[in-house]
């Protein structure tokens, strides 16, 4: 293990808060404001949601380059820059009133999300303290688990009392202040102290060993399927429960259960991390997801609560697994680029979720069955790398 990457200071709570801001502003917020946004721009709801979805595809296109920048300049610098870009994007949304301005705004927001999300925050934690990165990644995900709740409550208040443009200003200010915190208060001194003294280490995909290529490919499959399943399920839960129980209030209650149980899953990960292989906890978590999708088909309120608890714990654990497992096989000096490769299909899974949810919107049971069949992929992905030798 590289001594320069052990025991450094990690602003872990600041990184966690940055994920509340990033995911709240650039992912969760559009679920609440899409109707008002379409009216403001004079566009159809379908066109508006399509453009929002397309902004997520930007992650697929630039994730490898973001990974390169993360290795070259450090995760905190990339994160700070991404937050500033997102702030500009929401200011542009505040002023725009046409399709062209909307496209430009969402381009900036897409670039920002790629540069300021979990992928970069996890890389920063690994660069700063390789030895304790699993614990730090888990703490970061604690904050991310409550991003949707904080975002939806805040946006709901602003929308009801101050209107759509106040939301854009609030999100822009939040992103700007978070970026400014990293830029001024931390000033990157702690990160620089832990960066390698030599130039950026070579990392060429074609020059990787067969084992390294297999590991990256497996983790790409894991990331794509896990986030496709989670994002599609999360976007479809209210409609699914409403169709089964014919009661919107019950649907909202059931759909909200998984969020707190993500925290439970991540607490368990932190509790057992000292003596359990991250791949093993990931295997257990990946079994929770298909189990939850099986029992969710039973139209019983209490059974569905159990299903949502299992789903939340499963995804909560798998977020940590996906963030940490690459570090078992690759050095901190190249982790940004490794995660860049892995993040591209992961982002593709997230971007496909609105489209997939829309296809099955009239038959939610078929969607759940499809996702259930797909859920074997994360399990077998982790199973295949379980016996592979790690660098520790």
Segments and roles (model prediction):
Residues 11-36, 41-45, 62-66, 152, ...:
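Extracytoplasmic
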Residues 115-129, 317-330:
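Intracellular juxtamembrane helix-capping segments at the cytosolic ends
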Residues 61-99:
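Conserved MFS/SLC helix-loop-helix module at the cytosolic interface between two early adjacent transmembrane helices
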Residues 62-74, 265-277, 361:
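Helix-to-loop junctions at the C-terminal end of transmembrane segments
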Residues 100-116, 303-317:
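Hydrophobic core of transmembrane alpha-helices in multi-pass small-molecule transporters
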Residues 148, 332-364:
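A late C-terminal transmembrane helix in Major Facilitator Superfamily
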Residues 277-325:
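C-terminal transmembrane helical hairpin of 12-TM major facilitator-type secondary transporters
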Residues 26, 30-37, 212-270:
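Extracytoplasmic gate region of multi-pass secondary transporters
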């Amino acid at each position: 293990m590289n001594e320069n990457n052990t025991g450094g200071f990690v602003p872990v709570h600041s990184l966690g808060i940055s994920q509340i801001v990033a995911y709240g502003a650039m992912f969760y917020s559009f679920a609440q404001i899409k109707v008002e946004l379409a009216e403001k721009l004079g566009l159809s709801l379908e066109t508006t949601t399509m453009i929002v979805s397309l902004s997520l595809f930007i992650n697929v296109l630039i994730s490898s380059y973001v990974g390169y920048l993360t290795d070259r300049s450090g995760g905190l610098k990339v994160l700070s820059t991404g937050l500033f870009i997102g702030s500009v994007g929401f200011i542009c949304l505040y002023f725009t009133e046409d399709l062209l301005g909307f496209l430009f705004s969402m381009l900036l927001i897409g670039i920002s999300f790629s540069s300021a999300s979990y992928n970069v925050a996890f890389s920063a934690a690994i660069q700063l303290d390789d030895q304790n990165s699993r614990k730090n990644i888990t703490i970061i995900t604690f904050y991310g688990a409550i991003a949707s709740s904080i975002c939806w409550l805040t946006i709901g208040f602003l929308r009801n009392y101050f209107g759509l443009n106040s939301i854009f200003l609030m999100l822009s200010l939040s992103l700007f202040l978070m970026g400014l915190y990293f830029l001024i208060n931390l000033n990157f001194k702690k990160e620089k102290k832990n960066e390698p003294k030599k130039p950026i280490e070579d990392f060429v995909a074609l020059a990787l060993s067969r084992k390294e290529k297999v590991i990256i490919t497996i983790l790409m499959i894991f990331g794509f399927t896990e986030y496709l399943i989670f994002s599609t399920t999360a976007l479809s839960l209210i409609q699914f429960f409403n169709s089964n129980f014919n009661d919107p209030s019950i649907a909202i209650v059931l759909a909200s259960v998984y969020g707190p149980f993500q925290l439970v899953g991540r607490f368990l990960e932190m509790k057992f991390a000292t003596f359990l292989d991250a791949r093993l906890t990931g295997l257990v978590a990946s079994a929770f997801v298909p189990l939850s999708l099986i029992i969710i088909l039973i139209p019983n309120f209490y059974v569905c609560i159990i299903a949502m608890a299992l789903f939340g714990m499963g995804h909560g654990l798998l977020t940590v697994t996906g963030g940490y497992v690459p570090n078992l096989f690759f050095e901190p000096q190249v982790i940004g680029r490794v995660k860049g490769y892995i993040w591209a299909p992961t982002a593709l899974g997230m971007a496909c979720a609105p489209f997939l949810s829309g296809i099955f919107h009239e038959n939610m049971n078929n969607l759940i069955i499809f996702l259930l069949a797909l859920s074997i992929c994360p399990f077998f992905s982790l199973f295949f790398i379980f016996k592979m030798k790690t660098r520790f």
